[in-house]
UniProtKB/Swiss-Prot annotation:
Compartments reported by the entry: Cell membrane
Membrane as UniProt keyword: yes
Protein name as annotated: A-type ATP synthase subunit A
Keyword tags: ATP synthesis, ATP-binding, Cell membrane, Hydrogen ion transport, Ion transport, Membrane, Nucleotide-binding, Translocase, Transport
Record field: catalytic activity: ATP + H2O + 4 H(+)(in) = ADP + phosphate + 5 H(+)(out)
Amino-acid positions noted as binding ATP in the UniProt annotation, renumbered to this chain: 234-241
Main location: membrane
Family: Belongs to the ATPase alpha/beta chains family.
Gene designation: atpA
Assigned GO CC terms: plasma membrane; proton-transporting two-sector ATPase complex, catalytic domain
Amino acid sequence: MVSEGRVVRVNGPLVIADGMREAQMFEVVYVSDLKLVGEITRIEGDRAFIQVYESTDGVKPGDKVYRSGAPLSVELGPGLIGKIYDGLQRPLDSIAKVSNSPFVARGVSIPALDRQTKWHFVPKVKSGDKVGPGDIIGVVQETDLIEHRILIPPNVHGTLKELAREGDYTVEDVVAVVDMNGDEIPVKMYQKWPVRIPRPYKEKLEPVEPLLTGIRVLDTVFPIAKGGTAAIPGPFGSGKTVTLQSLAKWSAAKVVIYVGCGERGNEMTDELRSFPKLKDPWTGKPLLLRTILVANTSNMPVAARESSIYVGVTMAEYFRDQGYDVLLVADSTSRWAEALRDLGGRMEEMPAEEGFPSYLPSRLAEYYERAGRVIALGNPERYGSVTIASAVSPPGGDFTEPVTSNTLRFVRVFWPLDVSLAQARHYPAINWIQGFSAYVDLVAQWWHKNVDPNWKEMRDTMMKVLIREDELRQIVRLVGPESLAEKDKLVLEAAKLIKDAFLKQNAYDDIDAFSSPQKQVRIMRLIYIFYNQSQDLISKGVPLKKILDKVGPIEPEIIRIKYTIKNDELNKIDEIENKLKATFDSLLKEVS
């Protein structure tokens, strides 16, 4: 029998209970007769410090605390895709049906996976086979996009004694029995896993394949690889949420998990409304058929922000183990860090910089280190990845504050949003001077092999132009562009073309919202031709004004490509390219 404790003190979401000598760290407990879910975060003697994931209004000293004997865990199995959960993996749609209220009642307990729904199970092995951790024993077609693979749990191995025939089963039905050293272990279609423990894998690999997003600045300027980590810091109103929503909508991931952590509820509502209507550009099916939403909005309990991040990343690892590429989008980790600060203050811990706890960097590291591309456990051999992209909301856009500066230590892609770009209506407002990607050289090989062998050369030329333009900006402010050398005037003209034709992208335009890799390269090639050919002519003594008089009428056509030419109509770009080359050829003939 698991022992009970008693509440001795209540301080907001922190409850202190005694009589908890046998309790363990991170064990789930239920506080008072309301059965409020909490997690033990510190033990001193027989006292346990519990962070409660629901409102503690009405909880008083003397109330009972019931131990569960298990850590905070999630249910992993068929039925996850297309659902919206709260930070404790409680299905919000099921709660709405039961409670008949727009609010989540306290102490409500509904399993994450529907116990009534039947799934069509197709076995992939046979009785008598040797099985080990991660082996696929059968599959369930969960949605049109996702084939859910039923795995042997990581701690089970032995001989398959029984296996269910092909047919319809609920997640509670036993589909296999494994003889493990004489013990019969039942295997159901779902398994439970503690959220704070990373799921095991066979081998971690270097991320070499880009996670294509259809957003030009993210794919070409600062690319992210499958299994990579990225941060999007930016002040209020700079476009973090729209950029993250574009990532969730258009990225080439098989499964997308969107965690709304401490942000406005309207944003999650927007996702729920738009995802069923929008079509996945890679498959043509509704986006909700590959998406899981975890909503822990700003008006929900602060403590559950931490659990929502861990719930999301554990579900991501589960689909990675099935051999899928998963994208985890978290908006925003700053709200989670603020929850840590709040709880740290209530537990009277020594504060570090700006009041955040001293263990903030290690918590961020634990989270980002769960990303990666791996060879999954079990047979058949399969590759999966978890890519993490998180928003950071620094107060006043100060990138030196602790959450942003510590996040920078652990991510390999930095997409900083610049409020001055947002105010100038340049979206996505990613600052091309401050941003960086450590994956450029790794993903270049994929681009060269699958799209264009000159991809890196064109990208690097574009970046050099943008960096040089930034250096010239101060001079132009002081003395005007007329005093510049011809080649520097060309830099300003080329940079303007890069911004207007390539970097700016309208997330709400039907054609421009998603740009295929081929289309991105074709636009970049036109800019590359314009810059290189103009440079050659200037070196031969042709003034820039003369070049622009001839080429000027073609520039608006290059800028309009993103709005007017669809991803499957790239042959129309050939006409513009031929016209551009012919114009430069005629200029060259005039010089020679």
